[in-house]
Structure formats: structure tokens, C-alpha cells
């Protein structure tokens, strides 16, 4: 069995993340740009015509936006964040959206 490489040239990881989101049909990403996520947002800037990035002030707001976007459009809502903050605060936004 032969395995063909997926990439023909060296590509930065942040651009690869953006490419995967674009190829998956993701149209919107909600989150905070800072720390390591700033690099992903930078990669998403190359796909700004395909993937819209909405920056929020805190993870819980991004969680609510991603949840509501998913419910209204029946497409995946993506929350971008890092570390335990996105897990804790982002999940609060999802819970809040479910209880609304």
C-alpha cells in the first residue's frame, strides 16, 4: 500500500488549521485572539472569504454565539480558545444557550 502525502510544500500549522476548517465547510469561527489562538486567527486571515472570524470579549460569549449559530443554521458552530479558560468559560456559554 502506498501513502500519498497530503501536503506538497511546507505549511505552517496555523494555516493548516485554517485549511482544515475551510475544507470541512466551516463558515464561522467565534473566539478570542490571544496567546496561541492569535496564530490560528492569523492563519484564518488567509481564508477570510471562506471562514468568517468573530472576535469576542470572553469565552462564554463565544460559546453562546457558536451554539446559537449552530442551532439557527444547522451547521457546526466553532469556538476558538485556549487552555482551561475555553473549557470552563466556553462551556458556560453552551450551557447558557441550552437553558435559554
What does each model-found stretch correspond to?
Residues 1-100:
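N-terminal alpha/beta PP-like core and its mobile active-site loop of ThDP/TPP-dependent enzymes
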